């Protein structure tokens, strides 16, 4: 079992319950899922780029990504409906906690020129989204085998009702927010 999951149950729940005066433990916000998305617009010309992106995302997340397809045709981007244009993974349960732990302890500190994550990236409902410019910050990616440096979007979906609660939840895990 992931250390952060135990830490959440033993420590964070009690801290947040006291801070926000919840009457029940079930009111305390928790992390519901983490979604990783990698858009590969260049996949229109070279299918191998999408295969490499899928392999990278599979290595990072530990499960097979879903290839996303264009919802509608856009002439300006030369995209037709149904073209594969990216891949995504939704992590829940044990894999989610393991990824979250690796993200906080290993990956985020390896970001170049890192000064903390922006606190304004909450969506108004307690969910946090962040972008990573290089997939090579994750230790599962072998730098020598990378054909192209790609970015990815990471969305942490919580059961928090407000941004303040969501930020308190992530801050309780020592999430590296900008001061």
Curated annotation (Swiss-Prot):
Signal peptide: none annotated. It holds the Pfam family Ribosomal_L5. Part of the 50S ribosomal subunit; part of the 5S rRNA/L5/L18/L25 subcomplex. Contacts the 5S rRNA and the P site tRNA. Forms a bridge to the 30S subunit in the 70S ribosome. This is Large ribosomal subunit protein uL5. One of its GO terms (cellular component) is ribosome. One of its GO terms (molecular function) is tRNA binding. It comes from Histophilus somni (strain 2336) (Haemophilus somnus). The keyword tRNA-binding applies. InterPro entries: Ribosomal_uL5 (IPR002132), Ribosomal_uL5_bac-type (IPR020930), Ribosomal_uL5_C (IPR031309), Ribosomal_uL5_CS (IPR020929), Ribosomal_uL5_dom_sf (IPR022803), Ribosomal_uL5_N (IPR031310). NCBIfam families: PRK00010.1 (NF000585). Keywords: Ribonucleoprotein, Ribosomal protein, RNA-binding, rRNA-binding, tRNA-binding. PANTHER family: 60S RIBOSOMAL PROTEIN L11-RELATED. Transmembrane segments: none annotated. GO terms for biological process: translation. Gene3D superfamilies: 3.30.1440.10. The keyword rRNA-binding applies. This is one of the proteins that bind and probably mediate the attachment of the 5S RNA into the large ribosomal subunit, where it forms part of the central protuberance. In the 70S ribosome it contacts protein S13 of the 30S subunit (bridge B1b), connecting the 2 subunits; this bridge is implicated in subunit movement. Contacts the P site tRNA; the 5S rRNA and some of its associated proteins might help stabilize positioning of ribosome-bound tRNAs. Belongs to the universal ribosomal protein uL5 family. It comes from the Bacteria.
């Amino acid at each position: 079992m992931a250390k952060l999951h135990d830490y959440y149950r033993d420590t964070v729940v009690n801290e947040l319950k006291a801070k926000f005066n919840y009457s029940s433990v079930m009111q305390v916000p928790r992390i519901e899922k983490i979604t990783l998305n990698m858009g590969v617009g260049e996949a229109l010309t070279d299918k191998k780029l999408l295969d490499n992106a899928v392999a990278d995302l599979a290595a990072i997340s530990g499960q097979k990504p879903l290839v996303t397809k264009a919802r509608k045709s856009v002439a300006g981007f030369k995209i037709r409906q149904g073209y594969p244009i990216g891949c995504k993974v939704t992590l829940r349960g044990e894999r989610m906690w393991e990824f979250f732990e690796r993200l906080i302890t290993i990956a985020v500190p390896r970001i170049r020129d890192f000064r903390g994550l922006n606190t304004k990236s909450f969506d108004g409902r307690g969910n946090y989204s962040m972008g990573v410019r290089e997939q090579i910050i994750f230790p599962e990616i072998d730098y020598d085998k990378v054909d192209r440096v790609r970015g990815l979007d990471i969305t942490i979906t919580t059961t928090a009702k407000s941004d303040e609660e969501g930020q308190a939840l992530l801050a309780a895990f020592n999430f590296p927010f900008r001061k």
